[in-house]
């Protein structure tokens, strides 16, 4: 078997088993609770009564809503399944399989075939990711669109293709509609990349267009806010100012975040064993120690 044939055979097996893990007995094990019922009713009204909407699911902050992208994304799956939530969940699971392929594609493009296959294998077979991918909820499609955004940023950095700044801005806007907390990752990352790689932007028009496209993804929420007497801004102001949500010091926040990231990252491979999680941390840190001169 030739090298490229073996590569694609391994990739096929990874994608096949990734799909199997995410779809097997989904009709029997799918969780359908209040949030899923609320979303299904809203999409039912869209499909049968043509009631369009400007906002999506509520966030973890009272009175603040996501954008409507998740509902419009689910609508075709509910239409094809005639209202069956299992079909909608299966559609999101296939997007998760698409994320496995994108990890392979990005890994191969950036670091080579072996890294691409290993990344796809770890993500596709991760217990945590498999469980997450079988969940009918708005954060579920986030990895797929995040990887698309990362691909656009990579094309901008490596191949000097300024148009991909516009595409990445649009995708980041969609990601924020799926999970507001992703802004903590996306906004600083994009700003740092734009400052760092500013000389690669062929024309200022791409930056302006990128900002306009990003704002365009926020227009439904902006219109909803002013249509309802500033309800979203009022809720955001209440969260930040009146309730004093950020009481911890900067060092306390950093410490808690690092512990959380460690727990989440290591838990994707070893959900329960503390000792094996330490092994993950050691393996992850080793390249930075061994190749610190090249890294920094």
Predicted regions and their residues:
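Short helix- or helix-capping micro-motifs
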Residues: 15-18, 119-124, 172, 176
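Extracytosolic helix-loop segments that constitute the early lumenal/periplasmic catalytic or substrate-binding loops
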Residues: 21-25, 37-65, 69-72, 76, ...
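Transmembrane-helix motifs of polytopic, lipid-linked glycan transferases
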Residues: 16, 90-110, 147-148, 152, ...
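Transmembrane-lumen/periplasm boundary regions of multi-pass, lipid-linked membrane glycan transferases
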Residues: 40-49, 174, 183-291
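Membrane-interface transmembrane helices that cradle and orient dolichyl/undecaprenyl
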Residues: 1, 109-114, 149-167, 175
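Short acidic/glycine- and proline-prone juxtamembrane loop motifs at membrane-interface regions
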Residues: 128-141
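Transmembrane alpha-helices of multi-pass, membrane-embedded glycan-processing enzymes
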Residues: 66, 70, 74, 78, ...
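Transmembrane signal-anchor helices characteristic of membrane glycosylation enzymes that use polyprenol
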Residues: 7-36, 210-227
């Amino acid at each position: 078997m030739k090298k490229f044939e073996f590569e694609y055979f391994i990739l096929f097996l990874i994608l096949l088993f990734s799909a199997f893990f995410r779809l097997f007995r989904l009709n029997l094990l799918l969780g359908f609770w209040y949030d899923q019922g609320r979303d299904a009713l809203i999409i039912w009204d869209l499909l049968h009564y043509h009631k369009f909407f400007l906002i999506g699911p509520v966030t973890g902050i009272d009175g603040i809503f996501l954008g409507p992208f998740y509902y419009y994304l689910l609508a075709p799956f509910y239409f094809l399944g005639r209202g069956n939530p299992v079909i909608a969940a299966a559609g999101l699971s296939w997007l998760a399989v698409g994320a496995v392929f994108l990890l392979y594609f990005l890994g191969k493009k950036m670091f080579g075939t072996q890294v691409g296959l290993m990344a796809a294998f770890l993500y596709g077979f991760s217990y945590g990711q498999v469980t997450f991918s079988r969940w009918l909820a708005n954060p579920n499609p986030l990895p797929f669109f995040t990887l698309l955004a990362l691909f656009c940023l990579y094309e901008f950095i490596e191949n000097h293709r300024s148009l991909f700044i516009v595409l990445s801005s649009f995708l980041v806007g969609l990601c924020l509609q799926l999970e507001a907390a992703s802004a903590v990752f996306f906004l600083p990352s994009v700003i740092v990349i734009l400052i760092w790689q500013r000389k690669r932007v062929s024309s200022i028009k791409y930056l302006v267009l990128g900002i306009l496209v990003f704002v365009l993804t926020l227009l439904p929420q902006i219109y909803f806010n002013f249509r309802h007497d500033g309800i979203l801004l009022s809720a955001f102001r209440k969260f930040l100012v009146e309730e004093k949500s950020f009481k911890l010091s900067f060092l306390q926040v950093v410490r808690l975040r690092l512990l959380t990231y460690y727990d989440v990252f290591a838990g994707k491979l070893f959900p329960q064993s503390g000792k094996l999680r330490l092994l993950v941390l050691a393996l992850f840190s080793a390249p930075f120690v061994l190749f610190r001169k090249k890294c920094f």
